[in-house]
A protein has these predicted regions:
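Right-hand nucleic-acid polymerase module
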Residues: 1-140, 150-284
Length: 284
């Protein structure tokens, strides 16, 4: 007979360095899954956004580290796309150029995560230029954030955000570079993961509340590995741990070889306490 009420541990291994853990009550109470009132749809949207962002961080931490790169690519007036579809075509043409160059120079396959940020009107084919709207807030001018594996120089990656067919024999000549027809401003930096991995960059990408974001990845990224255990924790133990929410030693003992970097307790009137953990592998 299936257990009616229990505490589930879900481990999410993000590569060799990162581990996320959800410890959540699972109950058969119908009230636990209900949302009431006017704000229920907005609450669900907020939850969906939170889960999408978290999934992005998990995939990024699984596949990228400080040897890899972040590219910000924008559009100038001469090359401003009129639709989201056109912008997506532009950025995928760019990624194809990078893919070919990377294979030729390093022998590696390109790995990437792409975020395109835009205003909702662009989905309908009506571009909203950067400027003041009726709300008095700035519209989001369409642009891209790309995380890619290392191997090519930052200068060459920036050079390829252009309509010019690059002559690589002249590519190091400053005069040649000045004559390149850039699509817009482009900047490439090395990733700088902190104690929470790449989450800081994701927060930067998501800093604007206004506007929409569409993200996609290359097909060759590794997926986080998930393991579930319904017998490791009890409701009583979870209540005990919640009394000392800042105590990291509990989790060091529970997950040996890992250092907790984030601990987040949540309380629900129907199901009780749950906890989310992010841990980093202790380096020798």
């Amino acid at each position: 007979m299936a257990r009616k009420n229990f505490v589930r541990e879900k481990r999410i291994y993000c590569g060799k360095e990162w581990l996320e853990v959800d410890i959540v009550p699972v109950t058969n109470m119908p009230e636990a899954g209900k949302t009431k009132g006017k704000g229920s749809s907005q609450k669900q949207q907020n939850l969906n956004d939170k889960n999408s962002k978290r999934r992005f961080v998990q995939i990024a931490n699984t596949n990228f580290n400080e040897e890899d790169l972040h590219i910000s690519a924008t559009y100038n007036e001469a090359h401003l796309p009129m639709t989201l579809e056109e912008a997506e075509k532009n950025v995928h043409n760019y990624l194809n150029r990078v893919k070919r160059r990377m294979k030729r120079v390093t022998g590696q396959d390109l790995k990437y995560m792409l975020v395109t940020e835009y205003t909702p009107e662009e989905e309908e084919g009506q571009l909203t230029l950067e400027g003041l709207e009726d709300t008095g807030t700035k519209a989001v001018r369409i642009h891209h954030h790309i995380i890619i594996n290392g191997g090519l120089s930052r200068e060459d990656l920036e050079l390829m955000w252009s309509t010019t067919r690059i002559n690589w024999k002249k590519a190091q000549d400053p005069k040649y570079r000045r004559e390149v027809d850039f699509i817009g401003f482009v900047n490439c930096d090395r990733l700088q993961p902190n104690e929470n991995g790449i989450e800081g960059l994701v927060n930067y990408i998501n800093k604007r509340k206004k506007g929409c974001k569409k993200w996609s990845t290359s097909q060759n990224l590794k997926k986080p590995k998930i393991k579930k255990n319904d017998h490791k924790y009890s409701f009583r133990k979870l209540r005990e741990y919640a009394q000392t929410p800042e105590d990291k030693e509990i989790w060091r003992k529970r997950y040996k070889g890992y250092e907790p970097t984030k601990i987040d307790y949540q309380y629900n009137d129907y199901t009780g306490w749950s906890v989310y953990l992010r841990l980093r592998k202790v380096r020798d």
